[in-house]
A protein has these predicted regions:
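Membrane-interface amphipathic helices and adjacent TM-edge segments
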Residues: 45-112, 177-214
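Interfacial loop/helix-cap signal at membrane boundaries in integral membrane proteins
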Residues: 1-32, 135-160
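Hydrophobic alpha-helical transmembrane segments and adjacent short intramembrane/lumenal linkers
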Residues: 114-123, 130, 135-262
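Membrane-spanning helices that line or support transport/gating and their immediate boundary helices
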Residues: 15, 47, 51-54, 58, ...
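Hydrophobic alpha-helical transmembrane segments
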Residues: 18-51, 103, 156-167
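Extended low-complexity intrinsically disordered regions
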Residues: 30-60, 64, 71, 287, ...
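Cytosolic, positively charged, low-complexity intrinsically disordered regions immediately flanking transmembrane
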Residues: 242-328
Length: 328
């Protein structure tokens, strides 16, 4: 699978080297090739990244209204009323042009492209005498004779502390800043009383320290060539600049209204007071004391599910019934 993505990436690398190699010496040509390889590949998929970021922000912008509609939908008992609410939800999504699948789809392209980019750089820097994608054996051999400040690009990073340390510190700084900005953006739109979003935010917070530590450890103790450290620096710098641009666009075009901030603050309060757990515990005690109430509640939920199911069918078929329905 990764080899498929290596071919377009290696093709881009070959084209840049043909350009720079026509008027620069071998080492400088290859160094610039790596820089522009990162810029080209990440530049191509930047619109997909933006699409995912924008859909995430749009989802947050429409959430206060959607939450209100969902609250009404939970207590609906009439099919026609449920149909009206479902239509309002659909119109709300259309008004905001929200499509959650469009936010997820780019990941299926972005992740393999990043892996393909990393694999090309890693294999070109390796020791195997074989072509890499569209790069011929001659191209690979030329790359492996290239140096930066007298250090071969394919030497292990741990053998050249004086050269690698500044590049590694820069790379770790770039990725840490990028993660912190993304973390703060996520914090502003996270509902803390919902388990999955809250845990995803905690996971990202942990990654702020884990990722730099992992990269530092691998760089000094693993078989990582100097090329990869240089690639990290270029890649993380581009990602940081991209994130800053996205953040500026979000603040200007899609600012978060006070309703979103208020919803987040209320969710934090509910999470701290463990409101959901208290309600569940109270319901269990109430049902335990009155088993008939538990049966009545289960029957009501069943009727409510039937009403929603029929309402969704009607909305999907755009055919509202004139009289009472089976669910009623």
């Amino acid at each position: 699978m990764l080899e498929f993505f290596m071919y377009p990436v290696s093709g881009i690398m070959k084209l840049w080297h043909l350009l720079f190699g026509s008027f620069l010496d071998g080492s400088l040509a290859w160094i610039l090739t790596i820089v522009f390889l990162v810029v080209t590949v990440r530049g191509i998929i930047a619109p997909l990244n933006w699409l995912a970021v924008k859909q995430g922000r749009i989802g947050a912008l429409m959430r206060p209204e959607m939450t209100e509609l969902n609250a009404q939908l939970r207590h609906v008992t009439d099919v026609n009323e449920a149909v009206d609410l479902l239509i309002q939800q659909r119109e709300l999504k259309e008004r905001y042009k929200h499509n959650p699948m469009m936010g997820c789809f780019p990941s299926f392209i972005i992740v393999p492209a990043f892996l393909g980019l990393y694999q090309v750089v890693l294999r070109v820097s390796g020791s195997a005498n074989e072509p890499v994608g569209l790069l011929t054996l001659g191209d690979v051999s030329s790359f492996r004779t290239s140096t930066v400040f007298g250090v071969p690009l394919t030497d292990f990073a741990r053998e050249h502390h004086d050269l690698v340390l500044p590049m590694l510190i820069a790379a770790l700084t770039f990725t840490s800043l990028n993660t912190l900005i993304t973390l703060y953006r996520g914090y502003l739109t996270t509902l803390f009383d919902q388990k999955i979003p809250r845990r995803l935010l905690w996971f990202m917070a942990i990654m702020v320290t884990i990722i730099p530590w992992m990269l530092w450890t691998v760089a000094w103790h693993g078989p990582i060539p100097v090329t990869i450290i240089f690639y990290w620096g270029c890649s993380y710098l581009f990602t940081l600049l991209q994130t800053l641009v996205y953040e500026a666009i979000l603040r200007k075009r899609y600012p978060l209204p006070e309703a979103v901030h208020e919803q987040r603050r209320e969710s934090i309060q509910r999470w701290r007071t463990k409101e959901k757990k208290r309600k569940k515990k109270a319901a269990k005690e109430r049902f335990k004391a009155n088993p008939e109430q538990k049966e009545a509640s289960a029957a009501a939920r069943k009727r409510h599910s039937a009403v929603l199911a029929e309402a969704r069918k009607i909305v999907k078929s755009n055919n509202r019934p004139e009289g009472p329905t089976a669910a009623e």
